[in-house]
Amino acid sequence: MTTILACVTTVASVWTFNSAPLAVEAATGREIAPGVHELRVPSRGSCGWWETSSSVVPGGGVRFRATVEIAVDDPKDFVHNDFMMFVRWDFPNDGKNRSKSGNGVDKGKFYQRDFVVFADRKDGGRLVRTFDETFAVPGECDSVEIEFIGKWHPMTATIRDVKVENVARPKPRRVRCVVGSPFAVTGNNIIAARRRSGEAMTGEKTMAVQLGQIEKCLTNIFAHVENPDIILFSECLSTQGAPDPASVAEAIPGGPSWKLAEKYAKKYSCNIAMNVRERDAEGQCHNTVFVCDRNGKLAGLYRKVHLTSGEYQMGIVPGDGFPVFDLDFGRVGALICWDNWFSESIKMVKRNGAELLLFPLAGCAQDHVDTVFPSRAIDAGIPILVAMRQGHLPSGIIDRDGTWVAQTFDDCGYAVADLDLNDRKRTFWLSVGPGMGDPYELYYDESRPEVYEKFDWRKTRR
């Protein structure tokens, strides 16, 4: 163990280097200039880290920054979490019992651990990783330990420009989310009544009926919900009941559903998401979510990846990725119905940076409402807007803890909830030991995609 005096922005501190005690070949560290530290990982079995500490102001905010230049022996094998920066928050060491809500955190200093986010760029043969994130100081914590850790792939990392700054506490980033619930049953009754009267219900007429239901719901929402940020409707509402849904597949932007969303998005300055049968420029049909932003512009399209047999036998073509959309309040992803029974789907959306999931579907069963959808929110640590087409099951909003925070069963009704996308939900233990961790970050920062991608579906049978 090597101890070197150094300095962080807010306080004089001590830097200490450690190598994992069970490693066959030890990692090494040295100070190569004032405030510049080198970490060398010699082999697959090595792990080493530099650590230092700083005082913080309870109740305030702290911005952590650092630049790390990483030279690796084999760049193709280097993955996102081979080199990381994390912070460990400590309570005052005064012996007080600060156990909260039975989470097991009590007598002792360690309270919480967080990874610091980073951005990468290439500089010749090196990777330059810039860490930069601002946190709210948790509870009564008055100090923080900062660790830079390298592991498992041979590398030499140079750590410089480490800054720990007391700043204002981060403000909430509240988003007013609404899920509309039109024509759960009523839409089909209207169509049936017109057919009984002898009226020929073409695809275009059916779409007009259903879009009328959606517009009725939009009118209800804007009459009662002040300043919504985003509204979601359920799967393929506009073609429900059409004799041949593919015949009324529409261009996005430009089709009837788009024009309705554009009208209300611009009038009320609200992001509106709908799920439609889309016909693309090549003539192929997709099951598609689109988001129309507050200015009436297309923010993004998601095409359903996991199709049902009924869909592909109809001629629907699947999407081939999980894009996310940058809106004015944050980054949003989407999945459609059957997609969300595959846990990989929401993890891919999360891996692409989504902070909120749009999830329209045609229908499901009660146990899916009770277990599957909350589990997906917990899996990825992101909230979900659920727009259902069945009146006996809820449309609503699930927070990142997997709790339904709003529901509606009403035709042309709505569910509304204000979500704080800056709210860092913590859970006891996870991988951090006897302390609190943030699932939203941990499930990404400690995942092993390089292992998962070795799966060969050709050799695997159920």
PLM feature spans:
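Cys-nucleophile CN-hydrolase/nitrilase-fold catalytic domain and related Cys-dependent amidase chemistry
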Residues: 208, 212, 216-294, 365-382
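Beta-strand-turn-beta hairpins that frame and shape the catalytic cleft
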Residues: 168-179, 186-188, 324-333, 356
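C-terminal beta-strand edge segments of enzyme domains
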Residues: 125-130, 200, 324, 388-462
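Extracellular and organelle-lumenal recognition/adhesion modules and their flexible linkers in secreted
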Residues: 7-170
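N-terminal phosphate-binding loop and adjacent alpha-helix
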Residues: 181-220
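CN hydrolase (nitrilase-like) catalytic-core segments centered on the catalytic cysteine
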Residues: 252-273, 340-416
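Active-site catalytic loop in hydrolytic enzyme cores
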Residues: 280-355, 361, 371, 375, ...
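Residue-level detector of high-confidence beta-strand sites
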Residues: 100, 288, 300-303, 407, ...
